[in-house]
Curated annotation (Swiss-Prot):
InterPro entries with a match to the protein in the record: AAA+_ATPase, ATP-synt_VA_C, ATP_synth_F1_bsu, ATPase_a/bsu_AS, ATPase_alpha/beta_chains, ATPase_F1/V1/A1_a/bsu_N, ATPase_F1/V1/A1_a/bsu_N_sf, ATPase_F1/V1/A1_a/bsu_nucl-bd
Binding site for ATP: G169, G170, A171, G172, V173, G174, K175, T176
Record's protein name: ATP synthase subunit beta
GO cellular component: plasma membrane; proton-transporting ATP synthase complex
Keywords: ATP synthesis, ATP-binding, Cell membrane, CF(1), Hydrogen ion transport, Ion transport, Membrane, Nucleotide-binding, Translocase, Transport
Subcellular location: Cell membrane
Organism: Rhodococcus jostii (strain RHA1)
Principal localisation: membrane
Subunit and interaction comment: F-type ATPases have 2 components, CF(1) - the catalytic core - and CF(0) - the membrane proton channel. CF(1) has five subunits: alpha(3), beta(3), gamma(1), delta(1), epsilon(1). CF(0) has three main subunits: a(1), b(2) and c(9-12). The alpha and beta chains form an alternating ring which encloses part of the gamma chain. CF(1) is attached to CF(0) by a central stalk formed by the gamma and epsilon chains, while a peripheral stalk is formed by the delta and b chains.
EC number per UniProt: 7.1.2.2
Catalytic reaction(s) noted: ATP + H2O + 4 H(+)(in) = ADP + phosphate + 5 H(+)(out)
Length: 483
């Protein structure tokens, strides 16, 4: 093996100090360096390996100093073909990724390599992925609602501009579809820049997302960064930081409001757990890494608003076995401004988005921020739905006939509200054949207020299913009556 390795990741000159591999355990590689030339933590190292008919450069990230001139590193690529004695060079800086307009419309990996147009961005400005969060005096104190046009979200769990939103749910309840819908709406309605981080999810989903965004004409305003589930844990652990670094450039240098989508933040935690075990750390509760809270905090604290600019983050969070006490989702809760829980029972009823209106929360749902009228209507909707939930056991055992008359009226109203909370999505048009609806917040508040007051109790329940506004409900009711 050659002693010199050409640096190809990051801008600027590296230190090019040569070490050698002394131990390889899967993705964990121990490297020995000359005395006095030990690389810093998080530095990127390069090792050249030769496989049959192909030579490639491995990127290793320094994770621990072991003493005796040894460092323990985590490989960002499979270590097939890496042997003891292989020469390793220190780049002198962390993993760096391209930033700026050059990343829009392209797909990158965690190392900043462009996958759809190789070489894109490597000649321009690059930032290291390990960065400090904004100083306290730079943070934005003003609270502003991010209007999405999705009724259940805008009314019951309003998103804060520059905040962190969690999409909780088990497998197959619609987290990725809701993220795709938000990307489409932000690009179409607000002409905003989006950065998408695919963390440990299916490669097929990443391909589908790229093709759909290209088809809908929103790809040119979006940067995609993928570290999929077939890649080593080091890549899956760092891909969210790579995407966040690109988003920080748009916020701090270009002064833009940016949306950062992370799918799935649980895979970030899962990758950290794998790396922690490989590094020999003692596991904590349920086998997770002892540094879980610290790693989550380092990521989440960088996602914030500075004066006049913001990064709003929408994070899909897989809940293992639908257990919300699991340390991974529980640790994430502490950082979120709003939580949108996607419910399997609601999904099975055919109501989409399958948002649970009683368990989803938002810290800005208070009169001083959203206004007294919005607050009153949201609480009335929740009151009716909560009462309906309490009556369901009685209905299941004794039937509707045993309810008092006022409870029968409330149940009918609750079912209409429940169905009206769903609506057609733009990204689902080709599956449903129905156009997606965007409902202004003002219209949403008025519509739910009128339904709560009983103005539409005479219309059939099915007329409220997947409708946008009240005009759609009345049109559906006429269609049903015509049959």
């Amino acid at each position: 093996m050659t002693a010199a390795v050409t640096e190809n990741n990051g801008a600027g000159s590296g230190s090019s100090v040569a070490g050698r591999v002394v131990r390889v355990i899967g993705p964990v590689v121990d490297v020995e360096f000359p005395r006095g030339a030990i690389p810093e933590l998080f530095n990127a190292l390069h090792a050249e390996i030769t496989l049959p008919s192909v030579a490639k450069t491995l990127t290793l990230e320094v994770a621990q100093h072991l003493g005796d001139n040894l460092v323990r590193t985590v490989s960002m690529q499979p270590t097939d073909g890496l042997i003891r004695g292989t020469s390793v060079s220190d780049t002198g800086k962390p993993i760096s990724v391209p930033v700026g307009d050059v990343v829009k419309g392209h797909v990158f990996n965690a190392l900043g390599d462009c996958l759809d147009a190789p070489g894109t961005g490597r000649d321009g400005e690059q930032w290291g992925i390990h960065r400090k969060p904004p100083a306290f005096d730079q943070l934005e104190g003003k609270t502003e609602i991010l209007e999405t046009g999705i009724k259940v979200i805008d009314l019951l769990t309003p998103y804060v501009k520059g905040g962190k939103i969690g999409l909780f749910g088990g497998a197959g309840v619609g987290k990725t579809v809701l993220i795709q819908e938000m990307i489409t709406r932000i690009a179409r309605e607000f002409s905003g820049t989006s950065v998408f981080a695919g963390v440990g999810e299916r490669t097929r989903e990443g391909t589908d997302l790229h093709l759909e965004m290209e088809e809908m004409g929103v790809l040119q305003d979006t940067a995609l960064v993928f570290g999929q589930m077939d890649e080593p844990p080091g890549t899956r652990m760092r891909v969210a930081l790579s995407a966040l670094t690109m988003a920080e450039y748009f916020r701090d240098v270009q002064g833009q409001d940016v949306l950062l989508f992370i799918d799935n933040i649980f895979r970030f935690t899962q990758a950290g757990s794998e790396v922690s075990t490989l590094l020999g750390r003692m596991p904590s509760a349920v086998g997770y890494q002892p540094t879980l809270a610290d790693e989550m905090g380092e990521l989440q604290e960088r996602i914030t608003s500075t004066r006049g600019r913001s990064i709003t983050s929408l994070q899909a969070i897989y809940v293992p076995a639908d257990d919300y006490t699991d340390p991974a989702p529980a640790t994430t809760f502490a950082h979120l401004d709003a939580t949108t829980e996607l419910s399997r029972p609601i999904s099975q009823m055919g109501i989409y988005p399958a948002v649970d209106p009683l368990t989803s929360t938002s810290r800005i749902l208070e009169p001083g921020i959203v206004g007294a009228e919005h607050f009153r209507v949201a609480n009335e909707v929740k009151r009716i739905l909560q009462k309906y939930k309490e009556l369901q056991d009685i209905i299941a055992i004794l039937g509707m006939d045993e309810l008092q008359e006022e409870d029968k009226v409330l149940v009918g109203r609750a079912r209409r509200l429940q169905k009206f909370l769903g609506q057609n999505f733009i990204v689902a048009e080709k599956f449903t054949g129905e156009p997606g609806s965007v409902v202004p917040l003002r219209d949403t508040i008025e519509a739910f207020d009128r339904i709560c007051k009983g103005e539409f109790d005479h219309l059939p329940e099915q007329a409220f299913n997947s409708c946008g506004g009240l005009d759609d409900v009345e049109a559906a009711a006429k269609k049903i009556a015509g049959k």
